[in-house]
Amino acid sequence: MQALLLEQQDGKTLASVQTLDESRLPEGDVTVDVHWSSLNYKDALAITGKGKIIRNFPMIPGIDFAGTVRTSEDPRFHAGQEVLLTGWGVGENHWGGLAEQARVKGDWLVAMPQGLDARKAMIIGTAGFTAMLCVMALEDAGVRPQDGEIVVTGASGGVGSTAVALLHKLGYQVVAVSGRESTHEYLKSLGASRVLPRDEFAESRPLEKQVWAGAIDTVGDKVLAKVLAQMNYGGCVAACGLAGGFTLPTTVMPFILRNVRLQGVDSVMTPPERRAQAWQRLVADLPESFYTQAAKEISLSEAPNFAEAIINNQIQGRTLVKVN
């Protein structure tokens, strides 16, 4: 099988496509023929060695994949069945999806929902799955379309752009925040009623004028602090990212004076039941136009160069890897 293998030499990460024997695949009860994978920011960090994502080498990256079951010792899955996988540390500490085959635990797989195929599943990927979990978190907190505007930070990224599309389809008024002016028209086409520049969120006081009924934050740091200070009474912020940094220079004021909820959202270890629910919702709630968005299709051998481009903020939209 062909695979993108990451090896370490003199402290540097080297990425190359190699032919490997299936016997080298890690332990697991289901072997999958991978048809499509994708390149996420986390994959790009791993492939370029820019982030300490991978501790053990050699490693096959790829935190998402979709394909058909080759062999299964898990009664829930049978040969020929279409499946997808996101998260669970695959592509980080267990060989991942940037290979013609992957062997994983059945618990980590999701049967392909009706109305979805492998390519569409990878257009959604971890980014879209995380966005759906954030929307569900706002719903669970009682945030409704009639309550007011929802702000989405880091809106031109994978999670943010999907969140904008989902919220718009569900009837919410969406305001997008993006540091890239070139993406403003794109965000409006996804459903944002207006787009604010990120530098408006640089500094904040402990409490500011109430503006937002809900928020999905992918940035962290000062941007998240500003959003918290501007939340309506009883509002909820779903926080899922740290594109701007992992610190949070806030105070207790929004929480104790405005009853604001800060809800963390993790997509890696989401329990199977919630996971399946989110994928069903994605099929139902994503507009068909979402799948026609800019999605670059590349081969395994092109992945290292595209990983570099993703790190340098040169790619808009999804990067799909056609594996088989």
Swiss-Prot record:
Function: Probably catalyzes the NADPH-dependent reduction of acrylyl-CoA to propanoyl-CoA.
Family matches, as Gene3D superfamilies: Medium-chain alcohol dehydrogenases, catalytic domain (3.90.180.10), NAD(P)-binding Rossmann-like Domain (3.40.50.720)
Reaction(s) the record says it catalyses: propanoyl-CoA + NADP(+) = acryloyl-CoA + NADPH + H(+)
Annotated organism of origin: Escherichia coli (strain K12)
Result of knocking out the encoding gene: 100-fold increased sensitivity to acrylate, about 8-fold increased sensitivity to 3-hydroxypropionate. Acrylate is bacteriostatic, not bacteriocidal. Can be complemented by acuI from a number of other bacteria, including Rhodobacter sphaeroides strain 2.4.1 (AC Q3J6K9) and Ruegeria pomeyroi (AC Q5LS56).
Record's GO cellular component terms: cytoplasm
Keyword NADP part of the UniProt annotation: yes
Compartments reported by the entry: Cytoplasm
UniProt-recorded name of the protein: Probable acrylyl-CoA reductase AcuI
Subunit: Homodimer.
NCBIfam families named among the record's database cross-references: oxido_YhdH
GO molecular function terms attached to this record: acryloyl-CoA reductase (NADPH) activity; protein homodimerization activity
EC number: 1.3.1.84
